[in-house]
Amino acid sequence: MNVKQKMGMAFGVLAMALSPSALMAQNDWKLVWSDEFNTDGLLDSKVWNYEEGFKRNHEAQWYQKANAYCKDGNLVIEARKEKKARRNPGFRKNSSRWPENIEKIHYTSASVNTAEKKEFLYGRVEVRAKIPTAGGAWSAIWLLGRGMDWPSNGEIDMMEYYRRQGVPHILANACWGTDKPWTAKWNSKAIPFTHFTDRDAQWADKFHVWRMDWDEQSIRLYLDDELLNEIGSTATTQSTHLVFRKQKKMLS
């Protein structure tokens, strides 16, 4: 059986016409970039990059271009259980290293980013999306810095959805580097999915708006205008290399 889960979305990025510290003066917003995905087919290569292969977190899916496409004004990202597994071209017999030790590709999905094409510092980011909520889903809308290894480059998770100990949650997070290599300091809020579905049983069937307001002093993460998490000035000013005062690329 070929199992598919789909995620559809539209992006918009707004920047302040005045000082970034004046985030609440919403009349000063100026749209600097948006993507409405109005042309069916592949994403605009002037803006988006496709990832290829097994990438991170020891996840089961192989990322490939065919699983992300524009249709009817949405970016559609498909996670598939393939009818027929194919060989991992990077497989190395007797290797104990991931992903060289994975012989077959059973699941595929897509991950796209704006690295070196659309990067920004401060402002408002809005993403309208409908996310899959079936078991095994790990949808994400996130931002990373570049030029340093993770987590020293700083990570902002506008949205993550996955199951924690079997219970579905929506998360709004940020992390940054510490004195110990590859060890992150997290500011994370995990909201049980029932917080949303108790108010609207059809929540998962609808599009919703995730928003980030980012200035010199804080990062505020919203879902449908509800504040989920605020990462304050301690993180933005005392984190390694002041990573939240540097440009970020978008990923999904």
Model-assigned labels for residue ranges:
Residues S21-A25:
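Sec/Tat signal peptide C-region and signal peptidase I cleavage site
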Residues Q26-S252:
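GH16 jelly-roll
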Residues M1-F11:
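Bacterial N-terminal signal peptides that target proteins for export
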